[in-house]
Amino acid sequence: KYYISGAGDPRCKIMITMVKTSPDADPFRQQSQILVPIDTPGVEIVGPMHVFGHDDAPHGHMHIKFTNVRVPEENILWGEGRGFEISQVRLGPGRIHHCMRSIGSAEKALDLMIERGLSREAFGKKIIDLGKNMETISRAKIEIEAMRLMVLKAAKAMDVLGNKEARIWVSMIKAMVPEKVCNIIDQAMQVHGATGISQWSPLSGMYTSQRTLRFADGPDEVHHHVIARAEVKDYQESNLRTSRARDEIATGRTRGGV
């Protein structure tokens, strides 16, 4: 397994490990989550994975090798085959939290963009007045507020409808927010010039975090598939209901002699 976050931290003593235990079961019942002490024989931390060239030591995202690792059966959480179920309980709220923090990053990037635009001059003007920088600021603010409303709606759906029914809204914000925040940070770096990718600015670190988030807790493509599949299903069911209603009307007319 690789990109195991936090496994390099010396305080990490036990891992919650997702493994396939029931390959012949229904797809969502094949996985189990098992507690594995990090010092169990056969567990090898190969080393840190790099993210955009950084290893984030000592906490990091580790590459871990399992060779004939054995633990007691009672280490299975909730019972065999419930790993996916456990993950979904955590992932829904976790994705909302990711998006909330992402909006905070977008707000910070916008502040830095405005500060740079007002404090830096070129060609005798403040750079905020050059090119389309004012429009860039406007569009960033509009997108931030749109993202905020979407995240609030997803959180409301989670509170009122529960994890399962809110999953489409959660997928929508997870597919949308990190990508849009990446764009806002990218625009802020552009306003800063080369300083925006230097050690003098937090923007490059903010960008890599947001770009990485487009893989974490499900890549964009998975969430787009979930959204589109639900939308297609709704369309098909709606058309089926309409077709049935037409048939009932037609049948009623025939029986009534109309």
Each language-model region and where it sits:
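A short core secondary-structure module
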Residues: K1-V46
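Short alpha-helix boundary/capping segments
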Residues: G6-R11, D26, F52-P58, L91-R101
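Residue-level preference for beta-strand/loop junctions
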Residues: R11-K13, P58, G131, W169
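Structural beta-strand/beta-sheet cores of well-ordered domains, especially the beta-sheet scaffolds
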Residues: K13-M15, Q31-S32, P41, G60-T67, ...
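Short, low-complexity, polar/charged sequence segments that are solvent-exposed and flexible
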Residues: I16-V19, V36-I38, F52-D56, G83-Q88, ...
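Flexible, small-/acidic-enriched active-site or ligand-binding loops
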Residues: D39-R70
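Alpha-helical interface subdomain recognition
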Residues: H63-N68, E74, G79-R82, Q88-V258
